[in-house]
C-alpha cells in the first residue's frame, strides 16, 4: 500500500535525518518570525543558537540544508537583506576562491602525498617516531595546503592498508567486504583489533597535526584568510604575527604526541603488528615494481608543482585562490588529466563547504544588522587591554569547540575591526586581538569534531567505522591535545604575545596598517 502525500513529504524533508531533528527545525522556522516581530535582538540571538545547533548536529544532517533554510527565512522576514549578504560574500571572495580552487588543486597532488605517507608508514618501525613523523608531516602540509585534503590523503592511505590486510585475514580476495568481520579467521581477529588501534592513533595524530600547522599560516584554515584580510597581512606577516603563540604550541603539541605514545594514555600506543607489516610490505613491493616511468614522472611533476605552490604563497605572487587555480592547470596539463568528469571529481570535496560558508556569511549579515555582539564586545572592551586578549581567546575557544571555527572567527574579527574603526581600540591592540582570535578559533577547537572541519571529515569518512572511531572515542583521544593546546595557547597570549610582537616590530620584521 502506497503511503499518503503527507507521509511522503515528511520522508522527503531532510531525508534520513531523525524525526526529532526535522521537528526541531520546523519549530525553529515557525517561531522565528513571531519572535522577530516581538523583539528583533532576541530573535537574532535565537537564530545564531539555532545555526550553532545545526553545526553541532552535523552528523544528523549536513548543516548546509537546515542552516540554509534558516538563512533564507532570515532574509525573507527582514533580519538582513539579500544586498547585505551579497556584500559579505563579495568581501570574502578570496576565501571562497581558496576553498574552490586550492582544495581542488591539491586533489591532483594526491599521488605524491599518498607516496609520502606510505613511505613514512613502512619505513619507520618505532611507533613514537612514526606518530611524530605523521604529526609533523600533517602540520607542515597543512601550513601550505588545505587541512581537509591532508586528512583525506591520510584516510586514503589507512583505508587502502586496512583493505589489504582485511582481504588476507578473511581469505575472500576481491569479494571481501571490509565492514564484515564474520569471515575473519579467529587467530587474525586479535591482530586486526591491534591494527585498528594503531590506525586510530595515527589518524588522530595526523588530525591534530593539521590543527598545529593550520593555525600558523594564512592559508592553513579558511578563517585565517578572513583574519589576514581584515588585518592587511600577507603570508610572511601572518606567520610572524602568530609565531609568539603558535611556535610554543607546536613544540608542546609534538611533546604531547610523544608522551601519550610512550605512556599509552587515552587509547594511544598500539604498534603495527609484524604480521600486518609483512603483508603491507609485500603489497608495496609489488606496487613499486608495477610503477612505470610515466608514473614516476607524475610524482616528480607533482613535487615541482608543490615547490611552486609554497614559493608563490610565501612571496604572495597572486591571490591564494588563483595560485590554487594555477596548481589545477599545471597538475592536470602535465600529468595527462584531460577528461571533464575526472577534473570535476576534484571539486566534490570543496563545493558543499563553499556553499555552507556562503550561508555563514548570511548569518554574519544578520549579526551585523541586529548588532547582536555589541553587548559582548562592549563588555570585553571595558576590560584592560591585556585582559582583552585573554577574553577574546577564551570566548573564541569556547564557541569554536562546539561550533564551526570559520563561523566564530569571522564574527569576532568583524567586531574587533569595527571597534578599531570606531576608535574604541588602537591599531596596535587590534593586531594583537587578531592573533588572539585566530589562535582562539584554531587551538581549543580540537576538543570536538564540530570545531575542526578536518575532524568532522574523518568522523564521517568510510574509515571511521572500519577502525571503530566513534564521536566519543575521538573526543577522548583528543582530550590531552585539547588541554595542552588550549592552556599553552592561553599562556602565550597572556605572557609572550605582546612583548615578542613589540620586539619584532622594533627589529623591523613587522609592518602595520598605518
From Swiss-Prot:
Keyword Transport tagged: yes
Domain of life of the native organism: Bacteria
GO terms assigned for molecular function: sodium:proton antiporter activity
Reaction(s) the record says it catalyses: 2 Na(+)(in) + 3 H(+)(out) = 2 Na(+)(out) + 3 H(+)(in)
Membrane topology: Multi-pass membrane protein
Subcellular location: Cell inner membrane
Transmembrane segment boundaries: 23-43, 63-83, 97-117, 120-140, 144-164, 202-222, 238-258, 303-323, 357-377, 391-411, 447-467, 475-495
Gene Ontology cellular-component terms listed: plasma membrane
Cited function: Na(+)/H(+) antiporter that extrudes sodium in exchange for external protons.
PANTHER family registered for this protein in UniProt: NA(+)_H(+) ANTIPORTER NHAB, TRANSPORTER ARSB-RELATED
Family: Belongs to the NhaB Na(+)/H(+) (TC 2.A.34) antiporter family.
Protein name as annotated: Na(+)/H(+) antiporter NhaB
Taxonomic lineage of the native organism: Bacteria, Pseudomonadati, Pseudomonadota, Gammaproteobacteria, Enterobacterales
Gene: nhaB
Amino acid at each position: 500500500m502506497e503511503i499518503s502525500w503527507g507521509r511522503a513529504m515528511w520522508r522527503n524533508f531532510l531525508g534520513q535525518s531523525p524525526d526529532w531533528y526535522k521537528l526541531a527545525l520546523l519549530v525553529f522556522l515557525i517561531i522565528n518570525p513571531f519572535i522577530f516581530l516581538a523583539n528583533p535582538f532576541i530573535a537574532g540571538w535565537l537564530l545564531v543558537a539555532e545555526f550553532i545547533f545545526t553545526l553541532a548536529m552535523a552528523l544528523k544532517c549536513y548543516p548546509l540544508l537546515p542552516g540554509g533554510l534558516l538563512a533564507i527565512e532570515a532574509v525573507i522576514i527582514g533580519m538582513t537583506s539579500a544586498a547585505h549578504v551579497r556584500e559579505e560574500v563579495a568581501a570574502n571572495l578570496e576565501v571562497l576562491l581558496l576553498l574552490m580552487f586550492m582544495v581542488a588543486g591539491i586533489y591532483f597532488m594526491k599521488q605524491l602525498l599518498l607516496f609520502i605517507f606510505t613511505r613514512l608508514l613502512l619505513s619507520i618501525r618505532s611507533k613514537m617516531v612514526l606518530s611524530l613523523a605523521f604529526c609533523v608531516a600533517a602540520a607542515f602540509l597543512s601550513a601550505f595546503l588545505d587541512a581537509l585534503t591532508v586528512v583525506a590523503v591520510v584516510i586514503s592511505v589507512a583505508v587502502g592498508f586496512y583493505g589489504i590486510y582485511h582481504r588476507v585475514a578473511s581469505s575472500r580476495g576481491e569479494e571481501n567486504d571490509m565492514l564484515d568481520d564474520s569471515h575473519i579467521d579467529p587467530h587474525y581477529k586479535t591482530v586486526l583489533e591491534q591494527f585498528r588501534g594503531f590506525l586510530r592513533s595515527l589518524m588522530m595524530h595526523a588530525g591534530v597535526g593539521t590543527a598545529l600547522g593550520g593555525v600558523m599560516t594564512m592559508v592553513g584554515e579558511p578563517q585565517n584568510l578572513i583574519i589576514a584580510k581584515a588585518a592587511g597581512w600577507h603570508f610572511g606577516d601572518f606567520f610572524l604575527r602568530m609565531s609568539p603563540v603558535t611556535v610554543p604550541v607546536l613544540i608542546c603539541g609534538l611533546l604531547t604526541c610523544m608522551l601519550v605514545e610512550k605512556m599509552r594514555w587515552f587509547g594511544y600506543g598500539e604498534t603495527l603488528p609484524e604480521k600486518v607489516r609483512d603483508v603491507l610490505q609485500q603489497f608495496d613491493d609489488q606496487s613499486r615494481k608495477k610503477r612505470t616511468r610515466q608514473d614516476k614522472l607524475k610524482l616528480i611533476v607533482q613535487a615541482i608543482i608543490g615547490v611552486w605552490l609554497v614559493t608563490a604563497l610565501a612571496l604572495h605572487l597572486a591571490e591564494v585562490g588563483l595560485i590554487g587555480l594555477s596548481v589545477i592547470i599545471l597538475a592536470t596539463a602535465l600529468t595527462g588529466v584531460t577528461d571533464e568528469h575526472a577534473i570535476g571529481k576534484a571539486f566534490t570535496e570543496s563545493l558543499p563547504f563553499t556553499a555552507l560558508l556562503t550561508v555563514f556569511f548570511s548569518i554574519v549579515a544578520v549579526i551585523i544588522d541586529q548588532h547582536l555582539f555589541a553587548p559582548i564586545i562592549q563588555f570585553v572592551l571595558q576590560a584592560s587591554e591585556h585582559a582583552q586578549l585573554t577574553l577574546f581567546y577564551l570566548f573564541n575557544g569556547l564557541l569554536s569547540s562546539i561550533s564551526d571555527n570559520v563561523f566564530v572567527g569571522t564574527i569576532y574579527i568583524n567586531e574587533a575591526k569595527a571597534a578599531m574603526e570606531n576608535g574604541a581600540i588602537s591599531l596596535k591592540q587590534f593586531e594583537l586581538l587578531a592573533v588572539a582570535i585566530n589562535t582562539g578559533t584554531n587551538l581549543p577547537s580540537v576538543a570536538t569534531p564540530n570545531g575542526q572541519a578536518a575532524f568532522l571529515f574523518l568522523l564521517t569518512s568510510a574509515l571511521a567505522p572500519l577502525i571503530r572511531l566513534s564521536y566519543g572515542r575521538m573526543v577522548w583521544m583528543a582530550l590531552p591535545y585539547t588541554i595542552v593546546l588550549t592552556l599553552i595557547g592561553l599562556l602565550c597570549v597572556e605572557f609572550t604575545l605582546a612583548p615578542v610582537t613589540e620586539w619584532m616590530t622594533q627589529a623591523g620584521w613587522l609592518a602595520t596598517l598605518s
